[in-house]
Amino acid sequence: MQLCGSSELLTETDLGESQKQLKKKQKNRVAAQRSRQKHTSKADALHQQHESLEKQNHALRKEIQALQTELAGWGRTLHLHERLCRVDCDPCPVLLPSGCPIQAKQPSGQPAPLGYNGCQEQLGLFQTPGSSPRAQHLSPGPCSHESPGLLPSLLPSLAFDPLMVRTPLAQLSPSPVLSASSPSGSSLLGSFSKLDPLIPSPQDQLAPPQPLRQEQPTSGRLASSDSPAALGPECSQNREHLPALPGSSTHWQKSSVAPSPQALMAFPLLSSAKVHF
């Protein structure tokens, strides 16, 4: 009887433990299912994101290939145009027939290019007698206000050069570009215009000297009548028809009259500059 009672107690304890174990197993199964669902949901989201990125990458690759083909086509057309159309980008050539046109395009505040003054100087030196009237208009002729005392000093130095003797006397006058650009040239022209009424012309040098009071109004009239505005285009025609005098420089040097002391006292600029005519 005692053995049977002890066996019954053991079976009751085993049943309780087995039930607890079953409950734990069920809980573990539910937790495992939840974790599996979470992992599967995350994996599905990552897979969908990866597929979308692959689609975008494929579209971008197609666009890159299209742009590369277009770039290659533009490069070929550019290469063909460079062979056909060659453009020279020189700022200013050495010799120009009718002046440098780049100077007109330059703004007023910026300086002129380096080759512009050289173009104007070479146009003034290498001008032939039969040149265009536009080129002759650039350099003022002997009809303008120019002191005749400067020509005898320039002609002996140029008489030994055969190239410079062939150039007309109009080219020996100062260039308007140099006189306008350099302040020294403008000051010299101003002083020459002041001395112009006192210096006798070549026609007056051949005549006997007259008193100073009578010579000033006549020289002023001659200076006003010899201006290019008064003479007009006839001055250039008469200059071409006049014969060239071979001994004009020596004749002017011999026939030049020294200024009177009254003129030197009246104008101290002449005495200080020591100008000899």
From Swiss-Prot:
Q: What is this protein called?
A: Basic leucine zipper transcriptional factor ATF-like 2
Q: Which keywords does UniProt give here?
A: Activator, Differentiation, DNA-binding, Nucleus, Transcription, Transcription regulation
Residue numbers spanned by region Leucine-zipper: 46-67
Provenance organism = Mus musculus (Mouse)
Q: In Gene Ontology terms, what is a biological process of this protein? A: myeloid dendritic cell differentiation
Q: Name one GO molecular function term.
A: DNA binding
- Look up keyword Transcription and say if it applies: yes
Underlying gene: Batf2
Locations of Basic and acidic residues compositional bias?
Answer: 41-50
Q: Which GO terms describe its cellular component?
A: RNA polymerase II transcription regulator complex
Region Disordered: which residues?
15-50, 126-146, 191-256
Q: Which residues form a coiled coil?
A: none
Chain intervals for the UniProt region annotation (Basic motif): 20-42
Kindly name one Pfam family recorded for this protein: bZIP_1
